[in-house]
């Protein structure tokens, strides 16, 4: 198979290879490396590519297998490091106190919101309802829900920033 024909088969799926690698490896650098390695593997099998009915599926399988191999290698090396540097999984007391304090502040801020904004914020950001469910519960249209949610988030953000910057400015 000539290089041009190979590239005609691979270029359309190159972006999908990268996105799959990025999703599995969660690092752009690792995903780029994986993409290059997969393309090299496909090039080494270029004479067999014409026998595959779906080149894209074959490329995705090669990508998945390569990424899983990389994750296994990384996991094994991480296990060695963890055994050598074992640390307690218990959250430090200071961090726990800070998180509890921050949650109390957030609760007070949410309680100070207008009732409609508080309800929509609770339904969308805390309980993870979608807009259709919120519209059904509140008898509001999607635009009004988005506006109220945006205002609630903005008010929360501004009050948290004001709290965090207290005494600094």
At which residue positions do the language-model features occur?
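Structural recognition of an alpha-helix C-terminal capping motif at a helix-to-coil junction
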Residues: 19, 33-40, 44, 53-65
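DNA-recognition helix of helix-turn-helix
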Residues: 137-162
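A short, charge-rich alpha-helical start-of-domain segment used by transcription regulators
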Residues: 1-19, 32, 43
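Internal acidic/polar
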Residues: 69, 77-103, 108, 130-133
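Residues within helix-turn-helix
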Residues: 29, 132, 143
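Short, basic, alpha-helical segments at the C-terminal edge of helix-turn-helix-like DNA-binding modules
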Residues: 162-169
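Short helix-coil-helix linker/hinge
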Residues: 100, 110-117
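A short pre-motif secondary-structure segment
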Residues: 120-124
């Amino acid at each position: 198979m000539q290089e041009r024909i190979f590239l005609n088969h691979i270029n359309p799926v190159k972006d999908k290879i990268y996105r799959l690698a990025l999703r599995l490896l969660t690092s752009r650098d690792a995903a780029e490396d994986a993409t290059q390695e997969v393309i090299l593997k496909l090039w080494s099998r270029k004479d067999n590519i014409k026998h595959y009915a779906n080149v894209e599926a074959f490329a995705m399988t090669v990508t998945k297998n390569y990424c899983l191999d990389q994750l296994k290698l990384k996991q094994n090396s991480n296990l060695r490091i963890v055994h050598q540097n074992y640390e307690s999984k218990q959250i430090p007391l200071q961090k726990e106190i800070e998180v509890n304090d921050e949650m109390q502040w957030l609760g007070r801020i949410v309680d100070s919101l207008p009732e409609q904004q508080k309800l929509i914020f609770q339904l969308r950001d805390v309980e993870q309802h979608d807009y259709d469910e919120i519209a059904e519960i509140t008898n509001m249209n999607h635009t009004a829900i988005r506006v109220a949610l945006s205002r609630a988030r903005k008010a929360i953000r501004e009050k948290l920033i004001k709290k965090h910057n207290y005494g600094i400015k």
